[in-house]
Design a protein with these regions (language model features):
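Acidic helix N-cap motif at the loop->helix transition within catalytic regions
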Residues: 1-2
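A short, conserved beta-strand element in the Rossmann-like catalytic core
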Residues: 44-46
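Hydrophobic helical membrane-anchoring modules
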Residues: 101, 125-203
């Protein structure tokens, strides 16, 4: 805060309310402050901050509505993960593509840039996942609304300290949840976004 002053905002919440609700609160903050581009990433440097500009440029100048920092668009670019974790993540993305039809290689990625129109269109009340499957549901919902999604290759380096919260329970929840999400989408209408004007500010 001493270095960035008013540019750094810390939002504190009571208790554990889930990963998804934390993201949604951050999105709400960005929309309230009229930012046009909103990025999300892991704060443990698993995601390289130097890649942020590539995601931003893919949206601001490349025509994408959602830019994903992808581990799997050019082979498998993951460092310091055990092989079991790599295989679980890789095949989870294949599973999601097969079930949903979404044309995204890294469906579980958490490194993304959104244009504000995506976050304005997606109703947070209809996002049912609050765990890691939240990442899948946001991409799927954006795609169903007709937004353009692109993937930017990155190298994901696992955290040097701390432990992952990933578990078999979370994985199982995502597997079942993807089926439920796909079935639910058959009975839901996704209104296409109606473009108006676009300005050029970013957060």
């Amino acid at each position: 805060q001493q270095q960035y002053g008013s540019k750094l905002h810390l939002i504190e919440r009571e208790g554990k309310q889930g990963l998804g609700t934390a993201y949604i609160r951050g999105f709400e903050f960005a929309l309230e402050h009229e930012y046009d581009y909103v990025c999300e990433m892991d704060a443990d440097f698993s995601h390289n901050p130097n890649d942020l500009m590539e995601l931003y440029k893919a949206c601001a100048y490349g025509g994408a509505d959602v830019a994903i920092g992808s581990r799997y668009i050019k082979g498998v670019n993951v460092v310091n993960w055990p092989m079991g974790r790599v295989l679980m993540s890789y095949f989870a993305s294949i599973y999601v593509r097969l079930v949903t039809g979404i044309p995204v290689m890294d469906t579980t990625a958490g490194f993304k840039c959104y244009h504000r129109s995506v976050l304005e269109t997606i109703d947070p009340e209809k996002i049912r996942f609050i765990g890691y499957a939240f990442q899948i549901e946001m991409k799927f919902t954006a795609w169903k609304h007709g937004f353009k999604i692109t993937e930017v290759p990155i190298i994901f380096t696992d955290r040097a300290k701390g432990t992952s919260k990933m578990s078999k329970g979370i994985f199982k929840e995502a597997v079942i949840g993807v089926l439920q999400m796909k079935i639910g989408s058959l009975f839901r209408k996704y209104e296409p976004y109606q473009e108006t004007s676009v300005s050029q500010s970013a957060a």
